[in-house]
Amino acid sequence: RKRFSAFLLASALLLVFLTNVVFADGGKKKQTILTSGDYQYVLHKDGSAELLYCLSDDAEIVLPDMLDGHRVTIIDTISFSLSLTAVTLPNSVADLDHNPFGCCPLLQTISVAPEHPSFYTLDGVLFRKKDDALVAYPRGKAASSYAVPQGTSAVGERAFDCCSFLTSVSLPASVTEIDDYAFSDCSALVEVSIPSSVDEIGSCAFNYCTALSSIVIPDSVTEIEEGAFSECRALTTVVLPNSLTEISDYLFSCCTSLSDILIPASVTE
């Protein structure tokens, strides 16, 4: 019994240690997770902080621009309370390479200060100033349809991740790129209009859109990355563009209802 108890204690201590260490750069570098109030973060060489976790149960949160004297410049895919409905980004965050709020099922509004140097919001939806890309659509918004504003250049990585209320999304002629996982797991999405301005559809852009039954891809699209329509189990009809030369791996993987696909003569591999 004593040996078993000692083993359990050692295991518990090891678990505590591991939960306070993260790995960066492909697992080659250890970073200690630091705690400041309701937030956990790691430090970078320049002294800036990367926010990892929010421990608060509050429904509305204003994220800090400083933690223990360190400027918060990066927000990772943070673990929030499932009750989060509104979040405000600090002015210190200069960029987001993907939507960090995909795990917030009740989130309805994302806010930034009017003078924020890098982002702006329209009706609670987050956009990047430098290129007018749509960065994050709150997955708790109850609207069934959404028209992306004219002037938007791209739908960013995971921008509509897990937005289960949306049945229809229309994209303006200004959009040129649909990024990786842009509409991933939009389980109610039935219709999406892709304008002839789009030239690239990213990896897994529409994967697990299980209600999507048909898709027409315009001739402007020259690249569709792997798995873009994987797990679209209701998809029955696809029209591929004449500009396409290659069908990427797993493009229609597990599309169990697919019965009609038009492959143009331009496709050689």
At which residue positions do the language-model features occur?
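Sec-dependent signal peptide cleavage junction
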Residues: L18-Q31
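Structural signature of tandem-repeat unit edges
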Residues: D38-D46, S56-T73, L82-D95, C103-V125, ...
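A short, well-ordered alpha-helical element
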Residues: T77-I78, A159
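Bacterial N-terminal signal peptides
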Residues: L8-N20
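Bacterial N-terminal signal peptides that target proteins for export
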Residues: R1-L9
